[in-house]
Structure formats: C-alpha cells, structure tokens
Amino acid sequence: MTTLESAIRQIDRESRELLQQTFDVVNANFGKLFPALFGGGQARLILTGEEILDSGVQVIAQPPGKRNTSIHLLSGGEKALTATSLVFALFQINPAPFCLLDEVDAPLDDPNTERFCKLVRQMSAQTQFLFITHNKITME
C-alpha cells in the first residue's frame, strides 16, 4: 500500500510540474500572439484555483485602448482574435503538419484580417494551413 501511495504522489507531483510548465509556455506564447493579432494590447491566462490539477483557466484580454476584461465581454471580432491567439499559442507547443481553419476570419474587419493573415503566413513555414473563408483579403 505504501508503494502505491508513493507512486500516486510521484505521479501527482510530475503532473503538477508538467502542467505548470505547459501553462507558463502557453501563457507566454499567448502574451506575444495577442498583441501581434490586435496591433497592441495584452492578454494573459490565470489559473482560477489553488491546486493546479483542479484549477480552471480564465482568459483576460485587453485590446488596444480598452480595459482588462473577461473574454465574455468582448465583441465578436475581439473574441475571434483572442481565441485564435490562444489556439495558436497552444499550437506552437506541438505544431501539427496542417491546420484547418473554418471561417475564423468572418467577424474580423479588414485591418484585423490583414494581421491575422500575416501571422498565418509566418506560421506557414512549419504548418500547412487549409482555410474555409469568404473573405477576399484572406483568399489573397
């Protein structure tokens, strides 16, 4: 029984360490990608609990010229860019050979679409992107 409890403690300890390391890298990536997509501002992830293995994650975003806010209070385009920033932050940890994006640019205005396309072009050195879009800027 002692060996089993010891093994469980070791697994929990390693899980906490790996989850914290991954969270820190994703948070750093998210903090870099968000201003690149928004042309400024800042964003971060916050663990909502004391115990990382039981904790949730809250997304805090501050688009340029706005106050820190929860993702729920953002406009449709701001939500799309924030979510894209987070997905790409996760994607950078373990990039796949291809990525399918289905109309993620639909709620974006032209300047945001151009920044989004610029980031995708940069990331396309490692990953092939397949788009479903109606946006002419994205098609170019």
Where are these regions (language model features)?
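Terminal ABC-like ATPase head and other globular end-domains that cap long coiled-coil arms
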Residues: 1-140
